[in-house]
From Swiss-Prot:
It comes from Caenorhabditis elegans. The keyword Endoplasmic reticulum applies. A motif (Prevents secretion from ER) lies at residues 757-760. The keyword ATP-binding applies. GO terms for molecular function: ATP binding; ATP hydrolysis activity; ATP-dependent protein folding chaperone; unfolded protein binding. This is Endoplasmin homolog. Disruption phenotype: Adults show increased sensitivity to cisplatin, sodium arsenite and zinc. RNAi-mediated knockdown results in induction of the unfolded protein response. ATP binds at residues 95, 137, 150, 187. One of its GO terms (cellular component) is endoplasmic reticulum lumen. PANTHER family: HEAT SHOCK PROTEIN 90 FAMILY MEMBER (PTHR11528). It comes from the Eukaryota. InterPro entries: HATPase_C_sf (IPR036890), Heat_shock_protein_90_CS (IPR019805), HSP90_C (IPR037196), Hsp90_fam (IPR001404), Hsp90_N (IPR020575), Ribosomal_Su5_D2-typ_SF (IPR020568).
Length: 760
């Protein structure tokens, strides 16, 4: 809510000043008598006053000097509090809207308030020749006492206290913003661009008065012209030389579109337009031979000429549909509004329109685009201008980092509140706690909207924004479970459809206590992984995580509906096969203990943490399993492929070099043969070589990278030699060196050259 000190209540309620001093926007010239009088007349001409009138006005004007501390405050306002000068127009139009709101409210109980004119509008006119900008409204206007109480209040009590608190080094920046926010000086933004400001105003209960200031002092006087405005206020800005750009129609139109598009009242801009018109061609009358003038023919010749005309053009054509109830807005209106605020050529995928009440009241329309921006993740975490904040339909900013969390940066829309207190420049919120309340409600509404998307709509959404939701699970603990309900993953249950976590839990086996998942680069890779073999064979469903962010996402959730997540590529996978199955497994562990001990203590001594009999393998001979807190093969691949990873990162090196568990399949023929050889002799070189090769193939199958790729290639070559009965000692033949003979010059070429010389 834009509250002011007592002195500024009427100003913000009634200011919006536009000149009706012109009759049909024309100004009469006064005769020029002397050089001094000419300069004075120029000043008068701009205000629509004659020379005698301006002399009368100045002789009777009440002059007021701003106190020294007020000058300090004005400098603070002009030089410090506003980050960009263009907001002066926003402030003045906002004040004009307040003035129009007030007269409209008064007219509801007293129609006579509109006796002078029923028009309710804001008009903006630029005079480039004289570097003037006029802003006129037909609002409530101000009486002489209003001018003294309001525009003069800045020089009254409270200023000294305000400045002392503002300059107090012990006062926090938030407290300073609080003070400024309570001291409503939006009108004085005019001095950001103007050296001199003239306010002409007419209230129904008083005569027309003129207030004039150069920011150092001000005067108040009765307008000698009488009532030229009928009702309302006119502000004339004498623009600084560097502010001349604000006289350009396109600049003014763009600023209205940016800040004041949704003001309740029509905003008009004095615009020129060029059009082709038919114009009669004057011809000399034709004569006969005896000199008689021929009769004119009925049809006259015409030509097309360019003609420039000036007229008022309405510049705020888009209506604030969020002010209406959702059931009063057509679907096509939502689509057109989306396109107008986003400049997106495509229609939105979905929208939500709501109003919120409580600690802070606001209205909002939020949209989900059909396509994600191409640079969404290049700009992830940066301020994205997708949510526009309005206060009473006046644009405040879209430069917010905290209006929505980063993962919802694709959401587009508007938020409009009457309750937000703003600092003097309206560039920062005065009470950040209110913004947090709004943010919380916006997130809930967005998630509810996404939850309600039907099958086809959700599929389209998921294909574009699935990564955002997964990032949300990682970044937003307070909404983690709500976001988790939106997650979709491929699974072993259906090759053609994704599944929700809720649907997975419904299909879980009776004594299954964990949600199984396997991460990799593709569905083919994960569904053929040795880690899922026995689970799938036993009828357990496994989630297939094939996106780079998936494993991070799942790791951020400790559980879902009281079911923990279990990465099947890590330790901890247990399959309840009953007591007899457990006894059988213990028997296998005893049987293969010589092999597992030998692998751990001899063959793979420096490569593995331990060797165990696997419960998860069916077809594969072995697998390499990460510890519960280590990197899986997929995570290792992701971490090593980071574009900004350091060459030697201690943390990365720690995880990458952690020893893992080597699991063997007791039913595989290679493992059985290896057990026989080790039992017979632990010095068997073939067994040692086979164990090393088993470890390396298990490393690759399990998704890890090999540390010794050259050694692995050598061992594969040895296997190839053995399978082809090629001696391991057979050497590669030495390449023969072939010398090339030097080319001899061709005789034919020499003959040709000699013939050419002889001709010369």
């Amino acid at each position: 809510m834009r509250f002011l000190l007592v002195g500024f209540v009427a100003l913000l309620a009634v200011s919006a000043f536009i000149p009706n001093v012109y009759a049909e926007d024309e100004i009469e010239d006064a005769p020029k008598e002397t050089k001094e009088e000419t300069r004075e007349e120029d000043s008068i001409k701009l205000d629509g006053l004659s020379v005698s009138q301006i002399k009368e006005l100045r002789s009777k004007a009440e002059k007021h000097e701003f106190q020294a501390e007020v000058n300090r405050m004005m400098k603070l306002i002009i030089n410090s509090l506003y980050r960009n000068k263009e907001i002066f127009l926003r402030e003045l139009i906002s004040n004009a809207s307040d003035a129009l709101d007030k007269i409209r409210l008064l007219s509801l109980t007293d129609p006579e308030q509109l006796r002078e004119t029923e028009e309710m509008s804001v008009k903006i006119k630029a005079d480039r020749e004289n570097r003037l900008l006029h802003i006129t409204d037909t609002g409530v206007g101000m009486t002489r006492q209003d001018l003294i109480n309001n525009l003069g209040t800045i020089a009254r009590s409270g200023t000294s206290e305000f400045l002392s608190k503002l300059m107090d080094t012990a006062t926090s920046s938030d407290q300073q913003q609080d003070l400024i926010g309570q001291f409503g000086v939006g009108f004085y933004a005019a001095f950001l661009v103007a050296d001199r400001v003239v306010v002409t105003t007419k209230n129904n209960d008083d005569d027309q008065y003129i207030w004039e200031s150069d920011s150092a002092s001000f005067t108040i006087s009765k307008d000698p012209r009488g009532n030229t405005l009928k009702r309302g206020t006119q502000i004339t800005l004498y623009l600084k030389e560097e502010a001349a750009d604000f006289l350009e129609p396109d600049t003014l139109k763009n600023l209205v579109h940016k800040y004041s598009q949704f003001i309740n009242f029509d905003i008009f801009l004095w615009q020129s337009k060029t059009e082709m018109v038919e114009e009669a061609v004057e011809e000399e009358p034709a004569t006969t031979e005896d000199g008689a003038v021929e009769e004119e023919k009925e049809e006259k010749k015409t030509k097309k000429v360019e003609k420039t005309t000036w007229d008022w053009e309405k510049v705020n054509n888009v209506k604030p549909i969020w002010m209406r109830k959702p059931n009063q807005v057509e679907e096509d209106e939502y689509k057109q509004f989306y396109k107008s605020i986003t400049k997106d050529s495509e229609e939105p995928l979905s929208h939500v329109h709501f109003s919120a009440e409580g600690e802070v009241s606001f209205r909002s329309i939020l949209y989900v685009p059909k396509k994600s921006p191409n640079d969404m993740f290049q700009n992830y975490g940066k301020v994205i201008e997708n949510i526009k904040l309005y206060v009473r339909r006046v644009f405040i900013t879209d430069d917010f980092a905290d209006m929505l969390p980063k993962y919802l940066s694709f959401i587009r829309g508007i938020v409009d509140s009457d309750d937000l207190p703003l600092n003097v420049s309206r560039e920062n919120l005065q009470q950040h706690k209110l913004l947090k309340v709004i943010k919380k409600k916006l997130v809930r509404k967005v998630l509810d909207m996404l939850k309600k998307l039907d099958g086809a709509q959700f599929d389209d959404f998921w294909s574009e924004f699935s990564t955002n939701i997964k990032l949300g699970v990682m970044e937003d603990p307070s909404n983690r479970m709500r976001l988790a309900k939106l997650l979709r993953f491929q699974s072993s249950n259906d090759a053609d459809k994704t599944t929700t976590l809720a649907a997975y839990v419904e299909r879980m086996k009776e004594k299954q206590d964990a949600i199984y998942y396997m991460a990799g680069t593709s569905r083919k890779e994960v569904e053929t992984s040795p880690f899922v073999e026995r689970l799938i064979a036993k009828g357990y469903e496994v989630l297939f995580l094939t996106e780079a962010v998936d494993e991070y996402c799942i790791q951020a959730m400790p559980e879902y509906e009281s079911k923990k997540f279990q990465n099947v590529a890590k330790e901890g996978v247990t399959i309840d096969d009953g007591e007899k199955a457990k006894e059988a497994h213990k028997g296998l562990e005893e049987e293969f203990k010589p092999l597992t001990d030998w692998l751990k203590e001899t063959a793979l001594k420096d490569l593995i943490e331990k060797a165990v009999v696997s419960q998860r393998l069916v077809k594969s001979p072995s697998a390499l399993v990460a510890s519960s807190y280590g990197w899986s093969g997929n995570m290792e691949r992701i971490m090593k492929s980071q574009a900004y990873a350091k060459a030697k990162d201690p943390t990365q090196d720690f995880y990458a070099t952690q020893k893992k568990t080597f699991e063997i399949n007791p039913r595989h023929p290679v493992i059985k043969e290896l057990l026989k050889r080790v039992t017979a002799s632990e010095e068997d070189t073939t067994a040692a070589s086979t164990a090393k090769l088993l470890f390396e193939t298990a490393t690759l199958r399990s998704g890890f990278s090999l540390q010794d790729q050259v050694g692995f290639a050598d061992r594969i070559e040895a296997v190839l030699r053995q399978s082809l009965d090629v001696s391991q000692d057979a050497q590669v033949e030495t390449e023969q060196h072939i010398e090339e003979a030097e080319p001899e010059p061709e005789a034919a070429e020499e003959t040709t050259i000699e013939e050419e010389h002889s001709e010369l």
